[in-house]
């Protein structure tokens, strides 16, 4: 494989993103774009990069799956004792990025992560497939384990412990809602003259500005 990536280019030829056509509410605009991504056949359109940082500002990023979006924010689920869970506990300022490559679209979200209530976490947990509910009991996310065999043996033990459909939610497995302060929509355009609209939360609503590519 070549080490020089300078010639990896693609021309963007999708539709424009114009102020007069964009929704005044960024959540509504996101839902519109998300629905289009689903209809377009984008694989895993709810995959989003979640960036966190320690109290000292050391960054970390990984992909998680969006499970709900509303006026309250963007919701996902994970272990509170994972690296991201510990980082959000000490520094709740986070960022999200969605990239729908087939449509040449990106959405960036900046906000603060808030823990969901136990009732909300339970409600979602109980909708997960049985094996997925068992899997969260196998080990706390991000801890060191000795082998793949350990995981498989633990899964067998947990399955024996909870043979029926009723599987309790571990206290360390929970949900987070990112309450947005800024949301930017990026649409790739010809000649790299991309469209970028930035929504910033203000008292009583959202301010929209256009950014240079």
Predicted regions and their residues:
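Binding-site signature for planar aromatic cofactors or substrates
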Residues: 1-213
């Amino acid at each position: 494989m070549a080490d020089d990536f300078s010639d990896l280019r693609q021309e963007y030829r999708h539709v424009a993103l114009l102020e007069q056509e964009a929704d005044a509410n960024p959540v509504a605009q996101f839902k519109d774009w998300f629905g289009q991504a689903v209809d377009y056949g984008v694989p895993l359109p709810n995959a989003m990069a979640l960036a966190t940082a320690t109290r000292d500002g050391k960054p970390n990023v990984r992909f998680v799956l969006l499970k709900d979006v509303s006026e309250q924010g963007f919701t996902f689920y994970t272990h509170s004792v994972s690296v991201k869970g510990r980082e959000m506990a000490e520094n709740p300022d986070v960022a999200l990025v969605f990239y729908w490559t087939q449509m040449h679209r990106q959405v960036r979200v900046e906000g603060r992560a808030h823990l969901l209530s136990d009732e909300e976490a339970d409600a979602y947990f109980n909708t997960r497939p049985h094996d997925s509910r068992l899997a969260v009991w196998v080990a706390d996310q991000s801890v060191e384990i000795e082998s793949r065999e350990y995981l498989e043996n633990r899964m067998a033990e947990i399955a024996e412990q909870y043979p029926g459909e009723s599987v309790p939610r571990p206290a360390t497995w929970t949900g987070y809602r990112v309450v947005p302060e800024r949301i930017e929509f990026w649409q790739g355009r010809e000649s790299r003259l991309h469209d970028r609209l930035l929504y910033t939360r203000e008292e009583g609503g959202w301010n929209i500005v256009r950014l240079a590519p």
